[in-house]
UniProtKB/Swiss-Prot annotation:
ATP binds at residues 34-41. SbcCD cleaves DNA hairpin structures. These structures can inhibit DNA replication and are intermediates in certain DNA recombination reactions. The complex acts as a 3'->5' double strand exonuclease that can open hairpins. It also has a 5' single-strand endonuclease activity. Pfam families: AAA_23, SbcC_Walker_B. NCBIfam families: sbcc_Staph. It comes from Staphylococcus haemolyticus (strain JCSC1435). The lineage of its organism: Bacteria, Bacillati, Bacillota, Bacilli, Bacillales. Keywords: ATP-binding, Coiled coil, DNA recombination, DNA replication, Endonuclease, Exonuclease, Hydrolase, Nuclease, Nucleotide-binding. The keyword Nucleotide-binding applies. GO terms for molecular function: ATP binding; ATP hydrolysis activity; endonuclease activity; exonuclease activity. This is Nuclease SbcCD subunit C. Gene3D superfamilies: P-loop containing nucleotide triphosphate hydrolases. Heterodimer of SbcC and SbcD. Belongs to the SMC family. SbcC subfamily. Residues 181-210 form a coiled coil. One of its GO terms (biological process) is double-strand break repair.
Length: 1011
């Protein structure tokens, strides 16, 4: 990611500030300079806030970023533009705030834009805070904490990671590399193992419960097996067949006893049943004999009923004749009454028919007028049905005339406009070839002019650079002379005995211990004199002078290096500039020609646009002409249609108005309808009346004939009755009626006789059957048989219950054995499958030779990668003296993340706190850069085209500072834009580009400047 623009509104000390990072050349190192509190770090806060809504350091609350001098009604906002993966994006984030005078919070906003190459505009991608934050995180592939480590190294953050303990490093590395997922994996596996162990223990518990509930059938051997523990699964499996065998033997034994007693019980039940049947048959035989004696006592009365029944049967034919004559006589009387009623009905119908005929004659007198009206209706019916069409024709034909006049007028006006436009177009004599010729001339002139302008600017720039180059060369010459003077001065200083500085006390001690004539312990010669011949004050003075001259010399060498770098840079720029004085002499003339040609082109373009406008208007009016002609044809066609309809209407209806015709048609139609309705009703009434007369006349004749036939039948029945009475011996109709009254009781008499004979026969047959059944058979004592049955049944039930209990116990044992075997099989399979998981869980939770958890192992891997990257720079910065290494230690928890330093001079490891301030800075910077590179690799390979460092360089000496700067310069040359915040003056001299932050105590401003 490479920033291109940052706009801060009401943000910290910036009320409205625009920082254009495109002023920085690619791969450029620049310095951010300003007084303390001017807002340098706020630039980093602005970038981080735009991307993540947070400050650049954890200790700073984003709510404190709003400017104290901001307008109470204006929000704090940041607009940040940047490039990533050859794409441009813009993020606009506005913080929520309470407007002045309001009590409610105005919510924040977030808009994310992407630059579209085709339209050359930023297009909105997200406009909600939650979705926008997700879009940014997906785009960058990192979170805020990782961004701080990758792009921004804030104040105090360098040393924090270096000197922190394992626990603190674990927290930082966990966030950067999301290693919490390994702890979650470890906990997930641990919980899975715990759950699995619980399930295994639960299964052993269920096996124990099932085993303890197994039935032993009071068998001593089985009772002994019950003492087995659920963990002894192999012994349990061996014992199960013994339980099954004992249960099977008991079940077979009780089944045999149950079968024997069941046969005995069935036999006694059959015997009791047969004895009960015999006793009941003897009793039934006695009862039937008594019933037969009682029944035969009614024999005489039955004989009398039989004699009476014979007489009743003989009178039956007479009864039928008698009833037939009575029926005919009743029918005869009814027919006479009906005949009189028919005669009255016929008289009424004839009167009604005459009345209808007179009404018909009156109605027929209107027939001629009705026919005329009916013909008119038939002839004009289609006009009445389509009356709206003809009414519309009468109304529209007048409007049509108006439209035709208007259309003719518009056609004439449009024709005049078309003629005028054609004349105007003909007056404009210009074509595209003229435009193309002038455009080509303008193009050539523009290229020539641009080239001459560039040459003119190059000349000015060359003159400026030449002046600056001469000044720089003079400074180089002067500085070299100063360096030569300093070197000469350094050579002239007396360096004899310079190494004896600070050795005065040591020499005096030696002098006090020796005497003249002694042998020298150093050279071995005889001591001739112990006088003091070394001038220690002069040696110290020379030592200080050498140091002072060396400092001045180093400073001048640095100045010379910077001046030579600047001189080379200016020289390269001068050599790249193209200069030609001959080419720029006529630039004003070319510029004037270009203006003239542009004006000519504009004039021609205006004429072409005017002609195109006239042509467009002409085409429009031609379209209008065509539409007016089409409309005229349609109006004429409609007029012809309307005239045809009107003439047809007048011809057939004899009316000039539709309303009068409609009124007349309705009146005629109503008259005809009423006539037809009345005529149909009368005709219907006449026909119905005639039909009724015919029906009643036919009924009259039928009834007369029926009366004659009934008189003959009644006379014939009377003769037959007299003959039958004479045969039977009856003298009067009274005797006949007495016998006939008894005829009603015939069925009752027959039923009494039949019932008697049926009962007598039934009793006789039953007595014979029972006599045969009980012959030679003697009943036994019921009480004795029942007692025997009770005893047998009691024994049988006892064995049935015992057998059922045994079967139930055997089946329950079988079910429990199946469950136990299922649990055992599951346990064997599960233990075999889970053994590796159990072992893996213990290894991941730290129960291993290294005593490291999975997450700690992963973090150590990342830390060693970071240290490896850091050592590449630290060895160079420390002159191959120092190298970071991870402290090796074995303990539980997050151990092994401490860092110590290996000193190649002493060939020993040292605690990190033993480093000096400058050395600590070197190690911190190297570690921070190494951390940044590893995080970059792990974050999906996001391209780091920029880095900002907010850290003091004041603790470094001259040589260390140079080494640190070389490291940062190499970062720049590797493709990164590197920005540094520092107050060290040497950096201002070494870094030519400065982003200066100035403050007037109320607000701050920024600007880029070159040294």
């Amino acid at each position: 990611m490479r920033p291109t623009k940052l706009i801060l509104n009401n943000f910290g000390p910036f009320i409205h500030e625009v920082i254009d990072f495109e002023q920085i050349n690619k791969e450029q190192l620049f310095l951010i300079s300003g007084k303390t509190g001017s807002g340098k770090t706020m630039l980093f806060d602005g970038i981080v806030y735009a991307l993540f809504g947070k400050a650049s350091t954890e200790g700073r609350n984003e709510g404190e970023l709003r400017s104290h001098f901001a307008d109470g009604k204006s929000p704090m906002s940041v607009e940040y533009e940047f490039k990533i993966n050859d794409k441009k994006f813009k993020i606009s984030r506005q913080a929520g705030f309470i407007k002045e005078g309001n009590t409610s919070l105005t919510p924040g906003k977030l808009d994310v834009f992407e630059f579209d190459e085709e339209s050359q505009l930023y297009e909105l991608r997200e406009s909600k805070i939650s979705s926008g934050n997700g879009f940014i995180k997906d785009l960058l592939g990192i979170n805020a904490e990782q961004f701080r480590q990758l792009f921004i190294l804030p104040q105090g953050e360098f040393k924090k990671f270096l000197v922190s303990n394992s626990s603190d490093k674990q927290s930082i590395l966990r966030t950067l590399f999301n290693s919490i997922r390994f702890e979650e994996m470890q906990n997930l596996l641990l919980n899975q193992v715990k759950d699995e162990k619980k399930q295994i223990e639960s299964r052993y518990s269920r096996i124990q419960i099932l085993w303890e509930d197994i039935e032993t059938f009071e068998n001593d051997e089985l009772i002994q097996f019950k003492s087995l523990n659920s963990m002894q699964t192999k012994d349990i499996i061996k014992a199960i067949p013994q339980f099954e065998l004992v249960g099977q033997h008991l079940n077979e034994e009780y089944e045999q006893l149950k079968s024997e007693h069941n046969d005995a019980l069935e036999a006694i039940k059959r015997k009791i049943e047969e004895n009960n049947k015999l006793i009941e048959s003897l009793k039934e035989l006695d009862r039937n004999k008594d019933k037969k004696v009682q029944l035969e006592k009614n024999k005489d009365s039955i004989e009398k009923l039989k004699a009476e029944l014979r007489k009743i049967i003989e009178i039956k034919p007479l009864s039928q004749l008698y009833n037939q004559r009575n029926t005919k006589e009743q029918k005869y009387e009814n027919t006479k009454v009906k005949l009189n009623s028919i005669l009255e009905e016929l008289n009424e119908l004839n009167d009604k028919l005459e009345k209808f005929k007179k009404e018909k004659e009156i109605l027929n007198e209107q027939l001629e007028d009705i026919n005329i009206k009916s013909e008119y209706i038939d002839k004009t019916k289609q006009f009445y049905s389509n009356i709206n069409k003809y009414r519309e024709a009468f109304n529209e034909i007048k409007q049509n005339e108006t439209y035709l006049k208007e259309n003719n007028q518009k056609q004439e006006e449009n024709k005049n406009l078309i003629d005028k436009l054609n004349n105007d177009i003909a007056k404009i004599d210009v074509n595209n070839e003229n435009i193309d010729e002038i455009t080509q001339e303008i193009f050539q002139l523009t290229n020539t002019f641009d080239k001459k302008v560039t040459l003119r600017e190059n000349k000015k720039k060359y003159q400026s650079l030449s002046q600056k180059y001469n000044e720089t060369e003079n400074s180089i010459k002067k500085t070299k002379e100063q360096i030569s003077d300093l070197k000469l001065q350094l050579e002239n200083i007396d360096k004899s005995n310079i190494d004896l500085n600070d050795k005065q006390t040591f020499i005096q001690e030696i002098q006090n211990a020796l005497h003249v004539g002694d042998t020298c312990p150093i050279c071995g010669n005889e001591i001739e004199s112990l006088n003091e011949h070394i001038k220690f004050d002069e040696i110290a003075k020379n030592q200080n002078l050498i140091k002072e001259v060396n400092n001045q010399l180093n400073k001048k060498i640095n100045e010379l290096t910077k001046l030579e770098t600047t001189s080379d840079y200016i020289s390269n720029q001068m050599s790249e500039l193209e200069i030609n004085d001959d080419e720029i002499c006529d630039i004003n003339e070319i510029e004037q020609q270009l203006r003239t040609k542009n004006k000519e082109k504009e004039k021609l373009q205006i004429q072409i646009k005017q002609r195109e406008k006239l042509k467009s208007a002409l085409d429009k009016h031609k379209d209008i002409k065509h539409s007016l002609q089409i409309k005229h044809e349609k109006l004429l066609s409609l007029k012809h249609q309307f005239e045809t309809l009107i003439n047809e209407f007048k011809s057939y209806t004899n009316y000039d108005e539709t309303n009068k015709f409609e009124q007349c048609f309705k009146q005629y139609e109503q008259i005809v309808t009423d006539y037809v309705s009345k005529s149909e009703v009368l005709e219907k009434e006449i026909n119905q009346t005639k039909q009724q007369i015919e029906i009643e006349t036919n009924n009259l004749n039928n009834n007369k004939l029926a009366i004659k036939e009934l008189e003959q039948e009644i006379s014939g029945h009377s003769d037959e009755i007299n003959q039958e009475m004479k045969r039977i011996g009856l003298n009067s109709y009274k005797d006949v009626e007495i016998l006939l009254s008894k005829l009603e009781n015939k069925e009752q008499i027959e039923m009494k006789i039949q019932q008697y004979e049926h009962d007598h026969q039934k009793l006789t047959l039953e007595i014979e059957r029972l006599s045969k059944l009980t012959k030679d058979n003697k009943s036994e004592s019921v009480e004795k048989l029942e007692a025997t049955k009770t005893e047998i049944e009691s024994n049988y039930n006892k064995y049935v219950e015992a057998s059922a209990t045994i079967q139930y116990q055997v089946q329950k044992n079988k079910d429990k054995f199946n469950s136990i075997m299922d649990h055992i099989n599951y346990l064997e399979k599960e233990l075999k499958e889970q053994q590796e998981i159990f072992e893996l869980s213990e290894v991941l939770s730290g129960k291993n030779s290294k005593k490291l958890t999975l997450e700690n192992y992963v973090l150590i891997y990342y830390l060693e990668r970071i240290i490896h990257q850091a050592n590449i720079r630290l060895e160079r910065m420390s002159g191959e003296r120092y190298q970071l290494k991870r402290r090796e230690s074995i303990s539980h928890g997050y151990s092994g993340l401490e860092i110590e330093v290996f000193d190649f001079h002493s060939n020993k490891s040292r605690h990190i706190s033993s480093l000096s301030g400058g050395e600590t800075f070197q190690a911190s910077l190297a570690l921070a850069l190494g951390l940044s590179e590893v995080v970059q690799q792990e974050s999906g390979g996001i391209t780091l085209e920029s880095m900002f460092i907010d850290e003091g360089f004041g603790t470094l000496d001259q040589e260390t500072l140079e080494t640190a700067l070389d490291t940062l310069v190499k970062l720049k040359t590797s493709g990164r834009m590197v920005g540094i915040i520092s107050h060290v003056s040497e950096l201002k001299q070494r870094i030519p580009l400065i982003l200066e932050v100035t403050s007037n105590q109320y607000q701050s401003h920024t600007r880029f400047k070159w040294n």
